[in-house]
Each structure stands twice: as C-alpha cells, then as structure tokens.
Amino acid sequence: LDFPYKDTILKASMSKEDTDEDDLRPDEPFLNEVIAKEEIDVLLDKKILVNAKKYDENGVREIDRFDENDNLIIKGNNLLALHTIKERYAGKVKLIYIDPPYNTGNDSFKYNDKFNRSTWLTFMKNRLEIAREFLSKDGAILVQCDDNEQPYLKVLMDEIFGEENFKNMITVKAKVAGVSGSHQGRSLQNNCEYILMYSKDSEEFFINITPQKEQELMQYIEKLKEEGISWKYVQVITDFGERKYLGEIKDGSGNPIKMYEHRNTEIININELAKEKYNGDLKKAYYDNIDRIFDTTNAQSSIRKRVMEAMKSNADITSIDYVPTTGRNKGKVTTLFYKGPKRRLFTWLSDITYKTSDGKILRKENAGNLWDDLQYNNVNKEGNISFSNGKKPEKLLKRIIELCSDENDIVLDFFMGSATTQAVAMKMNRRFIGVE
C-alpha cells in the first residue's frame, strides 16, 4: 500500500486540541523517517509520566511507584505514551482493541483535503506498528472502523501484521436502517461497522470462546414462523420408560460403551402437550419441559456407526453410556439417546438454550462473523457515562474480550474515549491499559 507521507511520522496527535488553535499546530506535521531520524528519535524517546495518582477502594492518593499488577490509564498523546511504556509491556498484551477516528467529516483530519486519506493512514500506521510490539505471541488486535477507510485499513494491516495473520472481518450491525428515503436512488443507508481481527502469530493464536447470539426462545420461534422456516424442536419425551441393559461394545480407543433399550416410553408433540396440560400456553409448555424437548439427526460419527452395527433391539428408543475423550464432556459419563431402527441421534433443545437469572430462556447460536444481535440503542447511557458519539455497547466489548483473552490477561485500548473497554475488562477480571 503506497500513499503520500507513508515513510513519515505524523508529529501531532491529530486531536482537535492539536488542530483548532494556531499556536498548537506543529510547523512541520510530518517527519521523514530518513531525513528527520534524529528528531523522530527525540520525539519518540521515553517520556516522564507526571501527576500519577492511584484510585482504589480507599479513594485517590498520589504514588511514586507503579505496581505492574495495577491497571494503568495514561492521559496524553497515545503515540508518545505507547513508546514510553513499550519497554515494560512489549510482548505482554493478550488483546488490543481500538476504535480510532473513522476519518469522516466529523473527525479532525483537516490538514489537507487532498491528502486527507494519506494523513489518516500515516496516523494509523505510526500507531499500529508500535502496537504490534505489545502483543504476546498468542495475542490479537481488533480494530473497529466503518466502510469509509476499511479497505485501506485492511491492506495497511496486512502489511504490518502479515496477511497470514488476518483472522476475520467481523460485521457489526450498529444501527437500524430506518424507513427514510434520503439515500434512495444514490446508495443504501449504511448501518454496519467492521472489526478487523489479526493475530500476532497465527500458529500460536486460538479463539477462546465461540461468540454466541442470544434471543428469547419464543421470540426466536415466532421469527422463524413469520419467515416460513420450520422449527424442529417439537417432540417432548414425557416418560423415558423402563431402561434395560443390552450389553457392551468398545469405542475406537477401547473404552466401554454400554447399550440400553427403553420400553413403554411416551413422546408427545409440544403443541398437543400445550393444549392438554397448559390451556394452549405454548410458552409455558416449552419453559416447563425444556430438558425433555428434542429433535433427531442422522449426523455421522464413529460411535453412532458402532451402535448401529451392534444394537440388536427393536425398541423405538435406545441409549448408550460412555465417557468422551474430547469435547465439553471429556472425562464425564455421558448418555446419548437414539430413535427408531436407523438410530437417529437425539439433539436436546436444552443444549442450545440457557435460563437467565430472571427466568428467561434464551436460544444460543454461533455468531460467526456477523454480529447483528448487539443493541446500540441508548448505549450512550451505559455505565452512567454520557458519551454522545462513538460509544460502543458493553456487550460488544464483553464478546471481544471473551473471544481473545483469559482472566488476568492484559487488554490494551489506546483510543479510550468513554473507557468502555476498561470498564468491561475490569468486570471480567482482566488487567487493562488505557490511553486517552
């Protein structure tokens, strides 16, 4: 990616404080990395951090020594701050999330309209290059942007972090498109933002937790109905019947699989159950029987194949007990149920739902790289901090932090803004560094 000023350091921080007043504007905003090397070295040399204060449960007090286990917030030019603390934190940060200026008409990049994009790219390049040095080998950086600069930012980050370390471009639904016709005939209304995700080392990086979308169960079922999509979880096993031991086979590792048949089982459709027992209240029927509602699948597995070959029973319902060697039930005795002569595997509704503290049942679904379930409405009021523009939902930051870090890991955000990243990191028992 080539652009004017690429081989320079942008001297100012490009905030409104730097650009709005003549006496704060640098004489020469760009320093060439070859011609002005000495001046750049002086500019980026470590600075003395002053006015240090510690905030804890005992209030605020001045300190003269910093404990690395403490969280850190620095107020000042973020480029200079990063170079100042680099020696202490290089290779120690598990996650970097930033939400930089989007380089729109509302931002402060006004040096030269002709080179507006180049100025922004120089600004980002200077910061991303030093940010990479902070990441641990298994760390990741996520940068949020809109479609204005996303294509250019992607190529820039490919250059800095390596194309092989690109993981995802996550699309986030940030607002409702609405019914206004203001864009009609020219373009579609933009209601998405994007998060570019890169690892430090692709071989060392692993996603921590697969992000999940959540929706109240009955709302989800109603949505499918409106879209003409059938909902599969409609069978309820009300009685597991009499369980009889049939024998034992071995899995591929030689571990035992115990086989059973079930006689006198009772299965009913959820709609019939709602009519018979709940006066037609379908929600009540689902909520009361969530652990007994199922669908079946013919998904292939080595265990199912062994069961189909060995099971000599004409019972409609059969089951096995075994101990998985991998997966979420690793090392635990696990029961699988099968239906019919083809031994279709039971899949339980309870495995894709969970109950909240207030009694709601939410349906879970892998979010993938389309995050359209996060509410941006009234986000400016979250945390009792009013921030009219650019504030991100706490649920977004929670998802990102869960995705790429563990407890006690360090999370860095050098475009703090409303400090949502720091607030969520603290709630999730992560250490944080913030620069604003």
Question: Which residues make up each language-model segment?
Answer:
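Conserved proline-anchored active-site loop of SAM-dependent methyltransferases
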Residues: 91-106, 157, 411-426
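Conserved S-adenosyl-L-methionine
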Residues: 117-121, 125, 150, 394-436
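Flexible, glycine-/basic-rich loop-and-beta segments that form/coincide
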Residues: 177-247
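Non-catalytic substrate-recognition/targeting regions of SAM-dependent transferases
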Residues: 44, 49, 318-380
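Conserved Class I SAM-dependent methyltransferase catalytic core
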Residues: 118-171
